């Protein structure tokens, strides 16, 4: 059985060689994620070119995702290495560029003294250390240690419950975004999204560069959770970034928020990735914990489009095993749940949405061997995918970039074909491609969804039941 949920792999030192990339793709990688928090453009370009070459050599439509760092708040560097802070210690965080020690450290975020008030909590290193702000003096935030531990260079700071005034896009993010648009990435992810209008900042730059790519919102701030429906509407997809989200929200809320995001994304035909610590123990062990296996399985059974590996594939000791393990878990979960995925109660709001819903229902009634979408933008395929039909979903497109973009969407297998001007020619393309590949046989029924006339994005208006091998003539 073909796996329907997609696998996103973060690339890094453990997986940047051509040999490792080939193994990753063979093991099941559908999307390669580039974490632009690390490395430089030259290094990333080298790996990007390798991904494209290896994927083309293997005949696989692997998508490539550029993940922008966003306004991540970090401490600076410590002059003599890590220091230990104990309960009750006074510790200062300053915007001055000073070497860190047991009494103070600098921060990358110049707006910290303006955002923090006495009594606010500051979390360090994903909440491993907890500080309470006691006063603000100019560019210095004085804190008292509530939960101590080791603190070292460049550790992250989280400010739960605080409205951070940092911009949606930093100068570094803008430079990285322009580079990614010019390089040829398939998708962009924006970190620390707080409001729907954050999408406008990125799209304005896309407009300047004359490149429009799908934009994913990473949900990792409580402010974003408060405005989920609007953010899902404003962006082209969502990543449930459970690392920072689990630090800033009560831990017990994360699974509930995750399921809510998946449901909202299915309603709006937006792809959704569940990310962070999915098989975390496999960074250093060849097998995951039972809890991790359950985590992946339930994300798949809840209807996520994709599940993601981070450190497991970027710096872990078992990157290939992590992908093959995730592949096996997802397949097993789908074998159990494919016919039992929650149906969407909400009726479609557009003509294209109504036709996609009808196609899924007609396919089940006539015993179709495939649901086929002809698409210029990928939207028709995404609308079909949200119904999670057990019938294989095949997308045909003449737009090469759409193949990479649909690599993130549940269940979609994409074929690149020449553009044709008539719907009957589309049907001939389907027959020729799928008979040659041995995917279908004469007499098989398929349900075809397309726009007429062909070539107009967003014009889905036709549904057709076709028997493979039957005569097709121009009308």
Q: Model-predicted segments: where are they?
A:
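Non-catalytic helical/linker scaffolds that mediate oligomerization, partner binding
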Residues: 1-475
């Amino acid at each position: 059985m073909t796996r329907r949920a997609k696998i996103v792999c973060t690339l890094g030192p453990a997986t940047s060689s051509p040999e490792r990339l080939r193994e990753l793709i063979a093991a099941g990688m559908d999307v390669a994620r580039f974490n632009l928090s690390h490395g430089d453009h030259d290094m990333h370009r080298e790996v990007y070119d390798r991904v494209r070459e290896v994927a083309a050599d293997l005949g696989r439509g692997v998508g490539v995702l550029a993940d922008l760092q966003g306004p991540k708040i970090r401490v600076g560097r410590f002059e003599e290495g890590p220091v230990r802070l104990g309960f009750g210690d006074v510790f200062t965080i300053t915007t001055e560029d000073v070497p860190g020690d047991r009494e103070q450290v600098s921060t990358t975020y110049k707006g910290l003294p303006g955002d923090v008030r006495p009594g606010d909590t500051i979390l360090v290193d994903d909440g491993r250390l907890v500080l309470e702000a006691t006063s603000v003096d100019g560019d210095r935030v004085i804190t008292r240690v509530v939960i101590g531990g080791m603190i070292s260079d460049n550790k992250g700071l989280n400010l739960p419950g605080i409205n951070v005034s940092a911009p949606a896009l930093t100068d570094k993010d803008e430079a990285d975004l322009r580079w990614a648009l010019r390089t040829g990435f398939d998708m962009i992810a924006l970190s620390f999204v707080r409001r729907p209008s954050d999408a406008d900042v990125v799209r304005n730059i896309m407009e300047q560069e004359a490149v429009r790519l799908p934009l994913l919102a990473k949900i990792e701030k409580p402010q974003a959770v408060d405005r989920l429906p609007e953010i899902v509407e404003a962006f082209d997809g969502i990543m449930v970034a459970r690392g920072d989200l689990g630090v800033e929200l009560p831990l017990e809320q994360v699974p509930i928020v995750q399921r809510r995001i998946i449901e909202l994304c299915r309603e709006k035909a937006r792809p959704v990735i569940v990310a962070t610590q999915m098989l975390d123990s496999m960074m250093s062990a060849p097998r995951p914990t039972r809890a991790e296996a359950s985590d992946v399985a339930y994300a798949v059974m809840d209807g996520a489009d994709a599940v993601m590996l981070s450190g497991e594939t970027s710096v872990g000791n078992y990157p290939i095993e992590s992908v093959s393990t995730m592949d096996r878990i997802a397949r097993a979960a789908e074998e159990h749940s494919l016919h039992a995925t929650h149906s969407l109660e909400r009726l479609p709001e557009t003509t294209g949405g109504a036709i996609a819903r009808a196609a899924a229902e007609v396919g089940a009634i006539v015993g179709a061997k495939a649901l086929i979408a002809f698409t210029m933008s990928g939207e028709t395929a995404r609308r079909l995918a949200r119904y999670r039909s057990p019938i294989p979903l095949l997308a045909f497109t003449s737009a090469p970039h759409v193949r990479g973009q649909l690599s993130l969407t549940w269940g979609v297998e994409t074929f690149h074909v020449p553009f044709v001007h008539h719907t009957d020619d589309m049907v001939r393309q389907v027959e020729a491609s799928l008979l040659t590949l041995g995917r279908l046989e004469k007499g098989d029924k398929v349900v075809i969804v397309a726009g007429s006339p062909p070539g107009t994005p967003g014009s889905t208006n036709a549904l057709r039941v076709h028997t493979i091998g039957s005569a097709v003539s121009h009308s």
